[in-house]
Every structure is written in C-alpha cells, then in structure tokens.
Amino acid sequence: GSGYSRMFQYERTQSRIGGTLWEKPLQYIENSPLFSADRVQTPLLMMHNDRDGAVPWYQGIEYFVALRRLQKPVWMLTYNGEAHNLRKRQNRKDLTIRMMQFFDHYLKGKPAPVWMTRGIPAIEKGINKGYELSNGNSVKQKNRTQLRNKK
C-alpha cells in the first residue's frame, strides 16, 4: 500500500458515508462486510493479491479469517506480486481453472479438487497446484454434515 490514510474515501467519495468514523459509526459498521460475516451462507471463492492498490491486502485476509473462524466454506487465492486485476498470463489461467473447478463442484455436483479439500501448503505454492480431484467426501458433503451437526 501507499501508506496514505483511506478515510477520505469513506467520508467523501466511493463509499459515500458522508462523515467520519466518530460521527457515523453505525454506517461504517453497516458498510463493512466483516460485520456481516456471520450471515454468509453461500460458498465463497475470493481472490485478493498482495499488490492490490484498490483494497488493502489485510482487509481480504481479515475477511477470509473471519469466515474461516465461523466455519464458512471459503477459499482465498493470492497471486503474489499482482494487483487488483491479474496481469500475468499464468495467473489468469490458474484463476480460470480454479473458478471452473469451484463452480463445477458447487453448481454441477462434480468432485472437489485437492486445493479445495486439503489446501496447498505455502511451501508448495507454485509447485503443487492441487487441480486433481479428491477421493472420498466432497467439500459439499462435509459442509452439509457440519450444518446438520450444528442443529
């Protein structure tokens, strides 16, 4: 990030809250997806990159961690050195494959790939893609079991 404060954005521009955090605290809470994380019911595949100039990287991590703590079905893809939109061809191809696998699993009932069921350890990033399909229970089946057990 640039190191500049982003408060002006919320007070005067894109978010249109029209006041400071201290003047309108409820509007800031309502504007933040973090405070609605407990209401997320749809599986989420998010991409947030470390060079994103539009949204601070820590906000993506914060939201991802909140959803994981709430045991929501969420995956976060990070392409190191990339900004808000992907520029490197290999990363665009990787994102396309992962989106297809994600939607094939949740919309067509296909088996989940390894990257969704077991994840990819950081030390294997770029080496082991995890595209192969998992054996055993799918993510969807595990999520259904978790939901049943909560009731």
What are the residue ranges of the model-derived segments?
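Active-site-proximal cap/loop segments of hydrolase catalytic domains
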Residues: 1-151
